[in-house]
């Protein structure tokens, strides 16, 4: 088995020379301004080692990766009642598609497409004002990442609100079916702000530890969330975490993962490591092009695929 340090360093060195980097997201103006020639990677292992490469300490907008953290909190808050309002199946459609909602009476296919994440944000509002729900999300992210400096980028949140017409349509459509139970602007306010959380690869890899270690931040540490909840979230990351590219990611990488259009991916090697990669150029499905390549190479070199014999 090769040394993890060497594998990570080699991947970062090779991808620094890549000529094909995908395209940055342009429908959110603030994301369109991010320089494409960046790549970062961080791995936190079961023994507590942190391995960094490239732009691992550069903060970026985590976007849909935030859906992992809000799902964790919503399940803790309302439990399995959440699954009466959002499904657990891959969608096969674009992450912001409205088509499926019409056929399925306003219930989104899973909590990682935009419509599903808006339902999760709405669930976070049960008994709370939007500011309180956002405070709970930010506190949890800071806690699992062990870094109080993590913040919400208000400029990105404003940019999303000003251009989020498709998400507004999704929310209003679900509200018409009674799937959303709070004012649309409240649910969207939480959603836009959670997506604007700014983190680095180092932050993200640390934050994902509870998913890698059965609900704990270290294999022998105290439980942060129930092990069953962590396992179920990881299962959804494997089947639904990369939009309509989820099957391809599972085929090539074989790890639970959640991507965001900011170019980040959080991936989990159960019992072994939490991994974060970032490169802002996206493939046609909205997933980081170089990030996916990096994770494929890492999983293959370390035999970390959940399907490895």
Curated annotation (Swiss-Prot):
The keyword Zinc-finger does not apply. The keyword Disulfide bond does not apply. It is an enzyme of class 3 (hydrolase). Keywords: Hydrolase. It comes from the Bacteria. Transmembrane segments: none annotated. Substrate binds at residues 64, 114, 160, 167, 191, 243, 261. Belongs to the glutaminase family. This is Glutaminase.
């Amino acid at each position: 088995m090769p040394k993890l340090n060497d594998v990570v360093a080699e991947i970062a060195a090779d991808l620094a020379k890549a000529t094909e980097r995908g395209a940055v997201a342009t429908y959110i103006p603030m994301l369109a301004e991010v320089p494409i020639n960046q790549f970062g990677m961080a791995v936190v292992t079961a023994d507590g080692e942190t391995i960094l490469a490239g732009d691992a300490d550069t903060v970026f907008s985590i976007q849909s990766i935030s859906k992992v953290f809000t799902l964790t909190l919503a399940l803790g808050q309302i439990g399995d009642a959440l699954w009466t309002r959002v499904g657990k199946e891959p969608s096969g459609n674009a992450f912001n598609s409205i088509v499926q909602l019409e056929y399925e009476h306003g219930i989104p296919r899973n909590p990682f497409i935009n419509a599903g994440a808006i339902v999760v944000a709405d669930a976070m509002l049960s008994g709370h004002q939007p500011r309180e729900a956002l405070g709970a999300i930010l506190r949890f992210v800071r806690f699992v990442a062990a870094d109080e400096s993590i913040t919400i980028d208000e400029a990105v949140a404003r940019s999303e609100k000003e251009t989020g017409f498709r998400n507004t349509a999704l929310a209003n459509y679900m509200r018409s079916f009674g799937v959303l139970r709070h004012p649309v602007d409240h649910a969207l306010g939480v959603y836009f702000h959670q997506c604007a959380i700014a983190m680095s690869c180092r932050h993200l890899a640390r934050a994902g530890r509870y998913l890698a270690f059965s609900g704990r931040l270290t294999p022998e540490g105290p439980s942060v969330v129930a092990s069953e909840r962590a396992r179920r979230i990881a299962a959804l990351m494997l089947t639904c975490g990369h939009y309509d590219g989820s099957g391809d990611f599972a085929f090539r990488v074989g790890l639970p993962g959640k991507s965001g259009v900011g170019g980040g991916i959080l991936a989990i090697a159960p019992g072994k490591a939490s991994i974060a990669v970032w490169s802002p150029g996206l493939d046609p499905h909205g997933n980081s092009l170089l990030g996916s390549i990096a994770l494929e190479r890492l999983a293959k070199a370390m035999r970390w695929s959940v399907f490895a014999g």
